[in-house]
Amino acid sequence: MTENHESHVFDPVTPDSPETAVPEVPGAQAAGCPVAHGRAPHPTQGGGNRQWWPDRLNLKILAKNPAVANPLGGDFDYAAAFRGLDLPAVKRDIAEVLTTSQDWWPADFGNYGPLMIRMAWHSAGTYRISDGRGGAGAGQQRFAPLNSWPDNGNLDKARRLLWPVKKKYGQALSWADLLILTGNVALETMGFKTFGFAGGREDVWESEEDVYWGPETTWLDDERYTGDRELENPLGAVQMGLIYVNPEGPNGNPDPVAAARDIRETFRRMAMNDEETVALIAGGHTFGKTHGAGPAESVGADPEGAPLEEQGLGWRSSYRSGKGGDAITSGLEVTWTSTPTRWGNEFFHNLFAYEYELTKSPAGAHQWIAKDAEATIPDAHDASKKQKPQMLTTDLSLRFDPAYEQISRRFHENPEEFADAFARAWYKLTHRDMGPVQRYLGPEVPSEVLLWQDPLPARTGEPLDAAEIAALKEQVLATDLTVAQLVSAAWASAASFRGSDKRGGANGARVRLEPQRGWEANDPDELAQVLRALEGVKESFDAKGGKQVSLADLIVLAGGAAVEQAAKDAGVEVEVPFTPGRVDAAQDQTDVESFAALEPAYDGFRNYVGKAARLPAEYLLLDRANLLTLSAPETTVLVGGLRVLGANTGGSKHGVLTDRPGTLTNDFFVNLLDLGITWKSTSSAQDEFEARDASGKVKWTGTRADLVFGSNSELRALAEVYAGDDARQKFVTDFVAAWSKVMDLDRFDLV
């Protein structure tokens, strides 16, 4: 709905960036205030180590949302609190807000519904399928940078209007859920039947630092393209600060056909096909209007840059009253239908009934007006005024792009089909980042199984008991499979998980299905050998006529058995925790195209960097650790353990700093920190290295993902813990804990 990567593993800082600029404080120089222009920023302003070493690893992304930042405490159970809500009563309270216009920000057409639809859309619309980041799941629209994106102009007012509802229901209704629920209520009160709503989005209490929004340092800049307008991965918008595309056309060029290319690419990157794209654009633009009553120069600072007395509101306009009919948001001034607060099919009628000519809004933005048309479109604040139908450049893309036109005409002729398509696409848009349906809460969750939710079959039968688990471990270890093979297969299965959108993981055993079984990082031939052997173990166990074991459980159990054996060989007895209950998904429950987005282009835990990776390996390792929701200590111990267990992709010896591969020792850390060796680069890209001892003999080889644990001061401090003479037991214990965490990341059925 328009008005208008990899995570941050390092912190680019420019001299004039907002985080390094020092605000002028009246009287500061005269009073000797330390906050003086031209000085390095105080730590409270974002100064510190990053000021001096902007390319240093940002380990803070491995410590997201710490417990000390949560005012609710660790015992707060949001799911239980949400279940206690009277949801119909909440919706009635929201509906009352929607039709109670406030003088401080008057409602267009007497109804805030369209504004709230845009708010919900923009909350969810930051999601991108490539890394699963963005989306509505944590209510990040409240925080920088999203609260101040140009495309989110004046949505601060929408959230402020909802404060009475939030205040009434307190922590039983998160902001994240409230934003999406309000979008649904807005649609319903304007005559549309939604597909459903699920709660369960828990609020966080700090801005995300792990999302790469683009390389630009200026709003609406577009340095993200190369070649023939090829958009950088994993980005999902065409310009910095936009949700999707520029409504005026590419870089403001009012070309509907060229705009269609941008639309298709950006919507594809958030998992929408052409039909869903048309439904969302047309459905959203059935309601409300854009705002461009005057020049953009009249608009003040965004919420994050506004003075304290604005109390979190931004974009104060000096143009006339600055609100209502004088409001400025995108600079465009378009109302699409004659019934902007009621669901209908008029958008398509207006799209096809007229020829349009290019014009400009009062703010000077490119838009289109119907030729030879009557003035049928109402004014939002003056009932005596009417205007001709108008469209955005991106609206006309639905008419002039051949594929979009075909869909649009079908929807025009079949209103019920259009309504169903919009309902489903809206539900997908607003729930795409929530993960499996086990996480959905509330009485309005649809019963229909949807492929994009990565469905799993229902679990049947009794879970395995301790004796059966022990017997299966013995059977696994009696095969010809090595520790490295078993560990690698389990990691390939479980480490596909992404904490960003809760997709992937071991449950479902999709590692045996397309597309995962063919991923380069998973060593397809080696993986196939392991799966055949484990399927044999499964068949033997199942044939006894008692309980059945899923391959999903068996893959994880086998990896755990291998870890136990490797620890035993190192002289440490340990039991790897295992909770049965995983199920096996079928190929027809797996959207191959959608799952392809989960393929790792890099995995530092397996010392794997694919050809498409664009950052040095140590940054990519942190990005993968962030997606796996790992801390810095967990990342450190897992890398050290997986190296000595031989879990590298392709059997690479890089980083296998041990004479006892397959044994769970702390040798990786001991040998990395050995004062008797010297590391030197062996590649022009400086991504491969060799270590020589005093005699000049090559002792080890490694990559940037290995050497960083001796180079980065914070990671070295962690490596020193595990390299200590007293660390043998602690290393194994911590490795097992971190391993088990990864194996269970997708076990939402256990919550």
UniProtKB/Swiss-Prot annotation:
GO terms classed as biological process:
cellular response to hydrogen peroxide; hydrogen peroxide catabolic process
PROSITE patterns in alphabetical order = PEROXIDASE_1, PEROXIDASE_2, PEROXIDASE_4
What cofactors are annotated for this protein? heme b
Q: Where is this site: Transition state stabilizer?
A: 118
> What ranges does the record give for the region Disordered, renumbered to this chain?
1-22, 291-320
EC nos = 1.11.1.21
Gene Ontology, cellular component aspect: cytosol
Note whether Iron occurs among the keywords: yes
Catalyses which reaction(s): H2O2 + AH2 = A + 2 H2O; 2 H2O2 = O2 + 2 H2O
Q: Which residues form the active site?
A: 122 (proton acceptor)
Protein name as catalogued: Catalase-peroxidase
Native source species: Streptomyces griseus subsp. griseus (strain JCM 4626 / CBS 651.72 / NBRC 13350 / KCC S-0626 / ISP 5235)
What does UniProt list as this organism's lineage? Bacteria, Bacillati, Actinomycetota, Actinomycetes, Kitasatosporales
